[in-house]
Amino acid sequence: MNGFVFDKGIDITPVQSPMGFTYGAGVFGPEVEIRRLEDIRASLRDPQCKGPEQVYSIAMDVGKEEHRVLLNKLHLLFGVVTYSAGKLGQEPVRSQGHIHKISPYSGWSTPEIYEIWSGEAIIYMQEYAELSLIHI
C-alpha cells in the first residue's frame, strides 16, 4: 500500500459478523437492516441463482449528533451500506435498487453521493424508470 489512510470523517465502522456497523461516540444511527438473498431474488437477472445468504446491510439516517438538527432542517439523509463479497449468479453482489420519488420539499428527486470506503464498486444508475403493463 502507499500509506494513504482514508478519513471517513465519521466514526462508523463496518463489521463482518454479524454484518453491519458500529457507531462511535457522538454518532447516531438506527439498527442495521440486513438484506438477504431471498429478499432480493425478484430483482436479480437469475432469481434462482446462488450467492451469499446475507447480501448487504444498510443503515439509513446516520450522522454526527452535532449535525442532526441541520440535517433535519435541510431534509438531508445520510446512509451507509456494506456488501458481501462474491457474486449473485453471474452478476456482482448488489442492492435490489430503488426509485426516488419527487420531494415535495425541493421539487426534485433525492440525489445520491457515493463514497467507497474500501474495496471496489460498480455504480449503475438510471435516470428514469417507468412501469409498463402487459395485458395477456
Regions found by a protein language model. Name each.
Residues I134-I136:
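Conserved small/polar residues in nucleotide/adenosyl-binding loops
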Residues G3-V5, G20, V27:
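Intrinsic disorder/low-structure terminal segments
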Residues Y23-S132:
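Active-site region of the double-stranded beta-helix
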Residues P14-G24:
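Long, non-catalytic terminal segments
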Residues M1-T13:
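Intrinsically disordered, low-structural-confidence terminal and linker regions
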